UniProtKB/Swiss-Prot annotation:
Belongs to the ATPase alpha/beta chains family. One of its GO terms (molecular function) is proton-transporting ATP synthase activity, rotational mechanism. This is ATP synthase subunit beta, chloroplastic. It catalyses: ATP + H2O + 4 H(+)(in) = ADP + phosphate + 5 H(+)(out). The modification Phosphoserine is found at residue 13. Its main location: plastid. It comes from Lobularia maritima. Its EC number is 7.1.2.2. Gene3D superfamilies: 2.40.10.170, Bovine Mitochondrial F1-atpase, Atp Synthase Beta Chain, Chain D, domain 3 (1.10.1140.10), P-loop containing nucleotide triphosphate hydrolases (3.40.50.300). Transmembrane segments: none annotated. It is a peripheral membrane protein.
Amino acid sequence: MRINPTTSDPQVSIREKKNLGRIAQIIGPVLDVAFPPGKMPNIYNALVVKGRDTLGQEINVTCEVQQLLGNNRVRAIAMSATEGLKRGMDVIDMGNPLSVPVGGATLGRIFNVLGEPVDNLGPVDTGTTSPIHKSAPAFIQLDTKLSIFETGIKVVDLLAPYRRGGKIGLFGGAGVGKTVLIMELINNIAKAHGGVSVFGGVGERTREGNDLYMEMKESKVINEENLAESKVALVYGQMNEPPGARMRVGLTALTMAEYFRDVNKQDVLLFIDNIFRFVQAGSEVSALLGRMPSAVGYQPTLSTEMGSLQERITSTKKGSITSIQAVYVPADDLTDPAPATTFAHLDATTVLSRGLAAKGIYPAVDPLDSTSTMLQPRIVGEEHYETAQQVKQTLQRYKELQDIIAILGLDELSEEDRLTVARARKIERFLSQPFFVAEVFTGSPGKYVGLAETIRGFKLILSGEFDSLPEQAFYLVGNIDEATAKATNLEMESKLKK
């Protein structure tokens, strides 16, 4: 991994004298820059425009070289607004791709695409930066062992387990608990795996980014008193920013995650919200550069751009990056090129259901719609696989019977079906779980449930061991022993009321 020492001002001034160009044309966020013969910058080099606008205010715009046009000209995309720029202004070739701060000092902080802190907490205290453009790890460096990434969340670990170093798609509308699930995963990876997380907000609403930051502070995922104890670094490139920034902010977040994996040898969780906006920004940039559009108006380089990001998210022999990517599906069309290209890279899908959220079952992960390539007997073992399949079959049968129950009532069902419904309702409630990050809202302590405990609990419910217990005993508990203890308490309470 190439790490650059932080550039100091004297070096910049030497570089300014060395390679200086001038703006020849500006069309929105696209700049054409002329350089002296033999001094052309490389593709992806950072260019910096410094000067003053007509009102005398300072301008500092960073761009990235995208095309070499010939006649000693390059075409670059601006990473911030180009207001105030004019033809003839000096442009400095930085000689390297964009580089961003990396390491422990980034935890608890919010950055923009350039790696500049935007949280008003002063400069970042780090002496190391790293370029955002890198090759994916060589095949010989990869860790090819298939291992499960335990999250401590029952429904995920049992029915749609995550792969260590894998990629997971998170599907869900507004208000079904996506943010809380993300924060719980960040909390659990820090506690159980000693890992850290990086959150990349790609082209989403500024308000949502702010809400996430405030909730993270409230739930102590970000520790305001001691930032070094925080568990996450945040990188935002929101909806109002130019397409260049939205296209590169995912790479900025990934670069920070790679440092934790390769240098600190940690397990890292990388969140990208939303991967569709990354594709959308690439499509805008492609159109601005004058490329011929491909299917449905997307960029012709869609698969290449997606692959160059996704192939860097992997497990190596040093550590792993497990990525959870929120996927927006335009017009609910799964055949749209953007989600279709994303699906090719995913190992698991976690689908959040509005129906479960309405019932108050959190996390509202749909046990029948969520899938994982890891749920195979040779990977997870026979016991885990059989238990998961039986749970799914029971829930599927309950789903099929719901219409009959709604019309005729439970009494019209056969004895066997009534037993299936009773167990399915217990399973449905046992798939809920109190979260650590929700303690401040619910008042009940969070629970981390190991995989072995999860399997044991569901096996006991399926075997009929707890057919006599009330279903509310299984709601919002950790392992199965807590459910039996809760049942005893409920029984004592009902006796006292009598």
